[in-house]
C-alpha cells in the first residue's frame, strides 16, 4: 500500500514520440501522439486517484472532453512548447526530477524566476545537484578527473542542458 513505483509511464512515451516527430527525428504525427499523451496522462492520474481510500474517486472526464482540451492546448506554430509543457505537467510531483530535466533540457515550459536576495548560496534555480560528500571523501581522484578542474557547483551547467532554461525577472 504505498505509492506504486514506476519507471516510465505510457503518457511519457507518447510525449517522447511526439517530440521526436516534431523534431523530425522519426516519422510520425506529433499532434496525434501529443493528444494520445494527454489522454494517457489523464487516465493515469484518474486511475491513481481511484486507489485512494480516504475519499471517493473523482469522475474522470470523457475521452471527447480530454481531446477537446488537448486541441485547445496545441500550438501548431510551436509544437515543442505544447508537447514539452504537457510532458512537464504530466511528471508533476510524482517524477519531479524528470520534470526538472525536461525544463532544463528544452526550456519548456517557460519559467520565470526572481533572484532571491535572502539566499546567498542559491539565489537562482539550481542547474544541477552537487556530488555528495562521500564521493569527495572516498573517490576524489575520479571525481576530480570527471570535473576536469572545474568546481563542483550548483550552477555548473550540464552538457545537455540549455544555458537559458529559465528567465530572470526583476
Annotated model-derived regions:
Residues 1:
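Catalytic cores of enzymes that engage adenine nucleotides and/or redox cofactors via long glycine-rich
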Residues 4-25, 33-41, 82-88:
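Extended, hydrophobic/aromatic-rich amphipathic alpha-helical segments that build helical scaffolds
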Amino acid at each position: 500500500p504505498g505509492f506504486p513505483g514506476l519507471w516510465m509511464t505510457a503518457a511519457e512515451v507518447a510525449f517522447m514520440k511526439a517530440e521526436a516527430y516534431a523534431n523530425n527525428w522519426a516519422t510520425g504525427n506529433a499532434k496525434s501522439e501529443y493528444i494520445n499523451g494527454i489522454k494517457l496522462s489523464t487516465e493515469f492520474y484518474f486511475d491513481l486517484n481511484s486507489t485512494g481510500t480516504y475519499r471517493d474517486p473523482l469522475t474522470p472526464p470523457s475521452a471527447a472532453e480530454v481531446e477537446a482540451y488537448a486541441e485547445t492546448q496545441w500550438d501548431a506554430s510551436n509544437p515543442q512548447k505544447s508537447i514539452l509543457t504537457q510532458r512537464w505537467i504530466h511528471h508533476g510531483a510524482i517524477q519531479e526530477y524528470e520534470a526538472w530535466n525536461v525544463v532544463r533540457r528544452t526550456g519548456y515550459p517557460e519559467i520565470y524566476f526572481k533572484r532571491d536576495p535572502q539566499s546567498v548560496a542559491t539565489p537562482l534555480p539550481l542547474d544541477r545537484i552537487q556530488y555528495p560528500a562521500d564521493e569527495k571523501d572516498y573517490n576524489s581522484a575520479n571525481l576530480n578527473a570527471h570535473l576536469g578542474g572545474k568546481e563542483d557547483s550548483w550552477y555548473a551547467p550540464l552538457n545537455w542542458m540549455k544555458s537559458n532554461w529559465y528567465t530572470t525577472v526583476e
